[in-house]
Amino acid sequence: MKELKHLIYFENLLEDANNELVRKAEAEGDLAIGYTCFHAPEVLLNLGNCFSVRLRAPHTNSMELATYYMANNSCEFSRALLERALEGNYSFLHAMAGVDVCEANNRAIENMEIMHMQGEDKEKFFYCNLDIPYSDDEDCVEHIREQVSRKILKPLRENYGVDTSDAAIRAAVREHNEVCRILTEIGELRKLDIPPITGYEFAVLVLVSYTCPKRLILPLLRETLEEIRTLQVDPEKNYRVRVAVVGSEIDDPNLIGLIESCGALVVADRFCYGSFPGRQEIALSEQEDALTQVCRWYLQNTECPRQSSLHRVKYRNDHVAQLVRDFRADGAIYEQMKFCTYWSYERVIANQIMPRDYGIQVLSIDRPYIVGQSGQLRTRVQAFVESIEMKKLRAARKEEK
């Protein structure tokens, strides 16, 4: 199958947080707002001349400095971000939108603030730490609305003169929704028996939409969509099984590439930095202010296991089962970042519930942040692929009898 025209360019954009499009936007007077978590409402970080950059730590090798300030049994994703901050990799930012969702991420951003990782010449720079509720009722919506208004919108308005009006929020939602529509249309093609795009390629497209200014990446995404619409696919399928990947932070498309190299085509991506739920459209009505609707959407659509009330747990399990059905996956791979508190119990519970209650075959793994060409992970995925094939073979033989 022919390689996408802009794929190499997109891959190069993912080589550095301060990539070419980020530098271009800042040179034109735009403001880069860093964030790490779905719970920091992305669309509200793209008001006026602001643009969001979801932080990653590509090519991380050592985490020795970050481990000194945190702990060797804390989340490696958070330590990798702190390590890069200590190296000065995020000094291009104009603000950092943190969330008090998980302890490790919270500690990493607190260390960045204490040690002035933004540099000494940014008087208007601000850190914020949103207090995120554990559920999704209307009291929780009102709480997060107050948090966002006071900790993000107010300093953007007072420090940088950013328009935070209802009209500005609706304009940001329209731009956000166009990105979502493009990626959703591309993602829906993965339901086909022979998709015109691999899971790796789709992961690259989704990641550049998180890490680049929307106004600069949108023309390239539009062009890529048109290209994929007319792409000629190979007549023979080049995979053995189809899988959905569920879990925590996958900000490295090479992990998806590793899974696919074992014969498992990734057809659904329900993980942090994936398209579910982060690349689903936000529908706004005229009957209520945009800010409240945006806050409600993020609170009610989160897939984070931090929300531990029973109806939220069932919501997440049902959604995985729905994705497996819709994208005709043969199984699901649940992955978690090593030492992640919330996903450690979500993954273990799902490993029991999904096969028992939903009939979905599951591979459950915890992994380090730096995956590379992990032989152990490759072996486990290969074994999972073979187990699915054996199950299909037994079912076929049973039908013949």
Region locations from a protein language model:
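Redox- and metal-dependent alpha/beta enzyme cores, enriched for Fe-S-associated oxidoreductases
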Residues: 27, 38-39, 44-56, 247-312, ...
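Short, acidic/turn-prone active-site loops that include or flank metal/cofactor-
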Residues: 56-62, 132-133, 270-275, 368
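A charged, amphipathic alpha-helical module
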Residues: 1-31, 145, 153-281, 309
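Acidic/His-rich segments in extracytoplasmic proteins that coordinate ligands and/or metal ions
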Residues: 80-155
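TerminUS-proximal long segments
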Residues: 316-324, 329-331, 335-341, 346-401
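Glycine-rich, highly charged phosphate/nucleotide-binding loops
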Residues: 69-87, 308-321
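Metallocofactor- and cofactor-centric catalytic cores in central/energy metabolism, strongly enriched
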Residues: 12-22, 26, 34-43, 62-66, ...
